[in-house]
């Protein structure tokens, strides 16, 4: 077995990719650092893509050379045995350019995104027209920072510009300010321009499900640590695990099923039909579920999804009915919003197109800010863009890269997004936060701390017990001292076996207890 598992495997050598030098000195905003690994062989080393070149994320694993797996113990485990140096862990890394590149200096606003998408022109003229007689009330010019008013030469946010023209002064995203600012000439509203940008094929592609097709139907990376090697294969889904990660001493005889394929309550996999919980993603037998007849379901929630217990119902209802898309005002002119791709596919029902367009537009801005901070991160085996799929909460037929449970928290001031964090709320026990980043121009100003305080307050409102993060070894002390995180205790380590949490090579998981 040792001979087979080592055949074709080459020595991996890791090259350190430098972390961001612009960390918040005052709050020590931790920056996640990944390693760029290259597999060495007798073949020529493939060229590394220029950081400024747009890479093409491959969604079909079958396009890569065939990946033979060595299985043992009646096909219960798989061993990576690849000859091609472009496959495997070499694809997980940060391709960073110069941190002072122009895209990092652009304000993270919806207007800046519209300019970059060529939906509107920078310095293009906009106006507000009277609803009574159709006369022009105010004129302005589109800037990345906002709208330059022609009468007072002040740069205003779209909300402020609309209020300046005599409209409502509310900054609430549910107030149709963008719908009443028109582009001169075409007379299209700013809202129509945002909708047009979202409907562009490139933006629509960002929201697609990642269906991975391959000759081997099982994942090549462990769902718990994301590393290959000798893997236990679930007999019901694509998931694979290391024995050590699952705390299994011997390979199970007969059929073996992962935690996501067995009943959450009885731990069995049988012929009885099992439902999948809309919130935590775990399966369960109706007969095992307590108090099912006592539940009250909100029929306005799309798909009328079932839940495994009352705790998941409470978390889901609070998220989808009171938190997603709602702007929360903070001190000193800041606000924060919890975003998620708002469509029927992902179980969030929004009956107002205006709010949906605003949320989706902010997600587009948030993704670009996050990639400016971390670079483009690709999954080792499937080649998908991890950050993009996390921000857009894209689903997949591979559990390890199924990110449909993610939410994005954004911190804003003066119409600009200054900090972004990605969260996956599994249930009342565990929430993970694999990414958080501040805009380049707003670092060393405590932005991550502001957003972290808001996030933790909301998690306490949801009665969440623990917040889990992956950190590089170099940043663990910063997380501990500045944000109150600690190493995983034995109880949490056992709990995480039953969760699909995003993990990176060489990262260290930390936890913060939110509720005593």
Model-based region annotation:
Residues 105-108, 184-185, 189-360:
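PHD-type zinc finger and closely related Cys/His-rich zinc-binding mini-domains in nuclear regulators
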Residues 154, 168, 238-239, 263, ...:
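Conserved beta-strand elements of beta-rich interaction domains across eukaryotes
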Residues 355-441:
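A conserved beta-strand-loop-helix scaffold within acyl/acetyltransferase catalytic domains
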Residues 1-240, 244-247, 252, 260, ...:
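Eukaryotic, polar/proline-rich low-complexity intrinsically disordered regions
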